[in-house]
C-alpha cells in the first residue's frame, strides 16, 4: 500500500524535528537469546531520568524492510519526534527478520506464507500465534530489558505501544512484565480476532491479568474494530483503567484505516499523550 499521506507526515516530522534537540537516533544492539537485534533510540535533551515508550512495529508487508507501506526505518523516524516533543524517550526495536535485524532470522511473513502454501490457512494462523507467543514476544521483552539499562531512563515510568501485530505484542509484554504502567495499541488484532479463537481467548486472558492501563485505538474503517471493543468490554467489566478510541474513517480504504497511526497523527496525538501523561507521568 502506498502511503498517500506520507509527504504531509514527513513535513510534520520535519517541523517537529526543528523544534526538538538531539533528534538523530542512536543505533543500539541488544541480545534476544542468541540473536543480536538492532533498535533506534531517541532521548529528550537533558540528563533525565526520562519516562520511556517502547514501540513494537507491525509484522511487515511483503518485504522485511517495510511496514505500513513504507520503509520500517522511516516509520520510526516519523513517530519519534512526537514522543520526544512530549518528553518521552523512544525505543524502536527491530524484531528478528525485520529491517536492520533482517540478518538474524527469516522474515516472518515469508515463513507464514510458506506454511500456508504447504498446509493451508489454518496452519498459518496457528504458526502465527505460536511465533507471537514465543520468538516475537521474546524480542520485545529483550528490548524492554535493554531499555531498563539505558542511562537516563526512569525504569519506573515505562509504557509500551504498538501497531497491528505489534499492538498484540504490547499486550503480551504487559502481561509478562508488571513494571509496564501503560499500553497503547493501534489496530491490534484487527481482522485477526475473528479468524482465531485462540488469539481471542489469549488477548482476553491478557487484559484480565495485567494491571497496566490500556488504551485501544482503531479507525472506523480498520479491517475490524472487534478486537478493541471486546477487550474494552472486558476491561470495563473488571473496572480496570482503560480507554477505547474509535476514530472517524481515515483515507479511502481499510488499509488506510488500519494504518491510521501514520496516516493521521493529529487525530490521536493529544489523546494518546494525555493518556500516557496520566498513567506514566502522573
Regions found by a protein language model. Name each.
Residues 48-50, 59-102, 192-193, 224-225:
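Short substrate-entry loop that stabilizes the transition state in hydrolases
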Residues 104, 108-151:
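Alpha/beta-hydrolase active-site loop
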Residues 56, 93-95, 186, 247:
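Alpha/beta-hydrolase
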Residues 19-48:
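N-terminal cap/lid segment of alpha/beta-hydrolase-fold proteins
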Residues 51, 56-58, 218-219:
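The conserved beta1-alpha1 loop
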Residues 241-282:
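C-terminal catalytic histidine-bearing segment of alpha/beta-hydrolase fold enzymes
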Residues 132-209:
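Primarily recognizes the serine-hydrolase "nucleophile elbow" in alpha/beta-hydrolase
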Residues 182, 188-243:
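The feature captures the conserved acid-bearing segment of alpha/beta-hydrolase catalytic domains
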Amino acid at each position: 500500500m502506498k502511503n498517500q499521506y506520507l509527504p504531509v507526515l514527513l513535513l510534520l516530522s520535519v517541523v517537529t524535528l526543528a523544534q526538538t534537540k538531539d533528534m538523530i537516533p542512536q543505533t543500539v544492539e541488544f541480545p534476544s537469546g542468541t540473536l543480536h537485534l538492532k533498535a533506534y533510540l531517541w532521548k529528550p535533551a537533558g540528563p533525565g531520568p526520562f519516562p520511556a515508550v517502547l514501540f513494537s512495529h507491525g509484522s511487515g508487508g511483503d518485504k522485511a524492510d517495510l511496514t505500513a507501506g513504507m520503509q520500517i526505518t522511516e516509520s520510526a523516524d516519523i513517530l519519534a519526534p512526537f514522543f520526544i516533543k512530549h518528553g518521552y524517550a523512544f525505543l524502536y526495536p527491530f524484531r528478528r527478520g525485520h529491517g536492520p535485524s533482517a540478518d538474524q532470522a527469516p522474515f516472518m511473513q515469508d515463513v507464514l506464507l510458506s506454511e500456508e502454501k504447504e498446509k493451508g490457512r489454518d496452519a498459518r494462523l496457528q504458526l502465527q500465534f505460536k511465533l507471537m507467543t514465543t520468538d516475537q514476544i521474546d524480542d520485545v521483552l529483550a528490548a524492554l530489558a535493554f531499555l531498563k539499562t539505558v542511562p537516563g531512563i526512569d525504569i519506573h515510568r515505562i509504557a509500551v505501544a504498538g501497531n497491528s501485530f505489534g499492538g498484540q505484542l504490547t499486550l503480551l509484554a504487559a502481561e509478562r512484565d508488571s513494571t509496564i504502567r501503560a499500553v497503547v495499541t493501534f489496530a491490534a488484532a484487527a481482522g485477526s480476532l475473528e479468524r482465531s479463537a485462540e488469539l481471542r481467548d489469549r488477548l482476553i486472558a491478557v487484559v484480565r491479568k495485567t494491571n497496566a492501563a490500556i488504551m485501544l485505538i482503531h479507525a472506523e474503517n480498520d479491517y475490524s474494530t472487534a478486537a478493541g471493543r471486546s477487550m474494552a468490554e472486558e476491561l470495563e467489566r473488571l473496572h480496570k483503567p482503560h480507554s477505547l478510541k474509535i476514530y472517524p474513517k481515515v483515507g479511502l480504504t481499510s488499509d488506510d484505516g488500519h494504518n491510521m497511526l501514520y496516516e493521521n497523527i493529529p487525530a490521536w496525538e493529544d489523546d494518546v499523550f494525555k493518556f500516557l501523561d496520566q498513567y506514566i507521568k502522573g
